[in-house]
Regions:
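Asp-based, Mg2+/Mn2+-dependent phosphohydrolase catalytic module
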Residues: 9-14, 18-19, 27-140
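Surface-exposed cleft-lining segments at the edges of enzyme active sites
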Residues: 1-6
Length: 140
């Protein structure tokens, strides 16, 4: 990841993460298996997002991938949090949203590719990262 020729932040990421970091512990949880944690931190530094995140979790440092409950259980244990204290935000409906829901976490589906909305009591949908602070304020 750190050696990719192009690393770009999603539009609105800096603003959303800066707004959220004051009230939330922010962690990146990725299925990337081509990069170690240090590589991911290096990529985050390239786009200026490293200061907004507290932790990085990936396949190489957990040994599991989403949607495995073991992936989410590892993160909860490491952060000393319960499922009701965590909201998973991700762009994969199956891995991020349903995986989190099956592990007792609430989730937000970041569907930046279509206008589709899927919502239940356990998850919401956003299409732009600028929507995050408002939704998370409602959920807190």
């Amino acid at each position: 990841m750190k050696d990719w020729p192009i690393v770009e932040a999603v539009p609105g990421a800096q603003e959303a993460l800066t707004a959220l970091h004051a009230d939330w512990t922010l962690a990146l949880a990725t299925n990337a298996d081509d990069s170690a944690e240090e590589d991911i931190w290096a990529a985050l530094r390239r786009v200026g997002l490293d200061q907004e995140l507290d932790k990085v979790y990936c396949y190489t440092n957990i040994g599991y991938k989403k949607p495995s409950p073991k992936f989410f259980q590892h993160i909860l244990a490491d952060l000393h949090l319960t499922p009701d204290q965590v909201v998973m935000i991700g762009d994969s409906y199956e891995n991020d949203v349903l995986g989190a829901n099956r592990s007792g976490l609430r989730a937000i589906w970041f569907n930046w590719q279509t206008s589709e909305i899927r919502e239940t009591v356990r998850h919401r949908t956003i299409h732009e990262l600028g929507e995050l602070p408002g939704i998370l304020k409602e959920l807190k």
